[in-house]
Amino acid sequence: MSSATRSIVLTAIAILALLSLPNHSRSNAKPDDWRPLFNGKDLTGWKHVGPGEDTVEDGLIRTHGGMGLLYWTAEKFGNCRIKVVYKMRDHNDNSGVFIRIPIEPREPWMPVHYGYEVQIDNQPEDSKEDEYHVTGTLYSLTKPLARPGKPGPEWNTMVITLDGPHTVVVVNDVKVTDYTEGQPVPARKFDFEPQHGLRPNEGYIGLQNHSDNDIVFFKEVAVQPLH
């Protein structure tokens, strides 16, 4: 065997050996992997602001009182999917998932006005704004494409996709919201409705505790990169 041939053979063997090794970085960060933000035991990584509180009971996040906000402190999220699995204590209860919060909140109203609240409320109070307050809508800004939210103690799965300025909300495998920054939104009528304006592509996320009469349980909060 010539030295040139021997060199080629040894190089091929080395490449095959490398390919046979486990790719730890790939196996730990697959694009289709969901990364849990709630460990099922405590609220490590989360911080509460505003009235009320959130506790962990039987492996679930439970809302108490309000209106307050439990947000993930470690990082902002963009170009990802956010999965939230939740249920209501009663036939209908009010909560929400906040996205695109520009800075760490110090009180609960800043995320309402300068982020987006993805609503959890199957039967909003009777008003002209009802269409804009249904589960899966961007609160006060978008009408629902469908109303697939399940009542009472039934589990719901909400998946929020953040793709640059594009936001898509799917509830129980049914699309409810498909919104891109800059699309028309209804005029603001009440002080509690969000301020109009563009939101950042990346932001903090949080869970709302709405009031003493609105108890919601969260079983899973997870993120998945888009790219």
Regions found by a protein language model. Name each.
Residues 1-11:
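Bacterial N-terminal signal peptides that target proteins for export
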Residues 10-20:
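Bacterial N-terminal signal peptides
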Residues 21-227:
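Carbohydrate-interacting regions of secretory-pathway proteins
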